[in-house]
Amino acid sequence: MVDGEDKIKLIIIVGPTASGKTELAVRLAERFDGEIVNADSMQVYRGMDIGTAKPSPQLRQRVPHHLVDIVTPDVNFSAADFRREAAAAIDDIHSRGKSVFVVGGTGLYIRALLQGLVDSPSGDESIRRELVELAQTVGNEELLRRLALVDPETAERLHPNDRLRIIRALEVYRQTGRPISTFRSEHGFADTYYDCLKIGLRVERQELYRRVESRVEVMIEQGLIAEVEGLLRAGYTPDLKSMRSIGYKEICAYLAGECTLDEAVQLIKRDTRHYAKRQMTWFNKDFEINWVEYPESFATICNHVIEFFA
């Protein structure tokens, strides 16, 4: 067991593509003497810069970024690989007395880091809302006492102030009739070594889609076609997992004469919009995320971080 006071504190910044995560992370890391751990499944690949919207060299000079450019495009980098590499990077950053910011839109990677790789029961919003109201009425101590009656193992690990996890444990029991500790023991999950503040960037849908379309056009202007041509010349074939990602597969099709450039660009825009929608569906299921508007709420976000570190 790791006591709450001994856990490494992580600031986790999530949101859909083109929502401004990287810029926010850099500003916060500069403000709070931190370093960034990338949680984007495509930015790990060397030579795939434009199509992955990788942080610019200028941003990476301002703040150290980890798990960027760590493997070649022919490596099948997995969530398990990410979990291992991210944990090592977090330990390194923490050991040097720096704040840790985990930033990205790959929800599976973030879940792998925090919870392991086996699904726990999905959340039930109505049960969660009822338990939140109960906590406000009876208080955390009583809520923890009630958890101890049905799941003493989990209750023993939790502090009364850890309201979110108490509610989550009660929610799982109400849903399944089983203590959450039985899911943990079945899958061999260890107690997480992290204490997390999750910040999500919310962007109005039409504005997000406008940003997506603008970003795709900028990628073409910056040389996405030449980037893909270079990857193909280097021997990275279109059937690789990395080359089948959004932006690369469409340009590969264009270069193979399977569609026009305009058709490829329209497909990239469409597929990126769909991806952003899937990202929001994923993150909306996480009740621990504090959703904010950015950049309007930067001061509010800073206050959240200050309170978290206090």
UniProtKB/Swiss-Prot annotation:
Q: Where is this region: Interaction with substrate tRNA?
A: 40-43
Respond yes or no to whether keyword Metal-binding is given for this record: no
Q: What is its EC number?
A: 2.5.1.75
InterPro entries for this protein = Dimethylallyltransferase, IPT, P-loop_NTPase
Query: What's the catalysed reaction?
Result: adenosine(37) in tRNA + dimethylallyl diphosphate = N(6)-dimethylallyladenosine(37) in tRNA + diphosphate
Query: Keywords for this entry?
Result: ATP-binding, Magnesium, Nucleotide-binding, Transferase, tRNA processing
Q: Where does substrate bind?
A: 17-22
Q: Which GO terms describe its biological process?
A: tRNA modification
Output the SUPFAM superfamilies linked to this UniProt entry: P-loop containing nucleoside triphosphate hydrolases
Q: Where is this site: Interaction with substrate tRNA?
A: 106, 128
* UniProt keyword Glycoprotein present: no
Family note: Belongs to the IPP transferase family.
How does this chain assemble?
Monomer.
Protein name, per record: tRNA dimethylallyltransferase 2
Which organism encodes this protein? Geotalea uraniireducens (strain Rf4) (Geobacter uraniireducens)
The encoding gene: miaA2
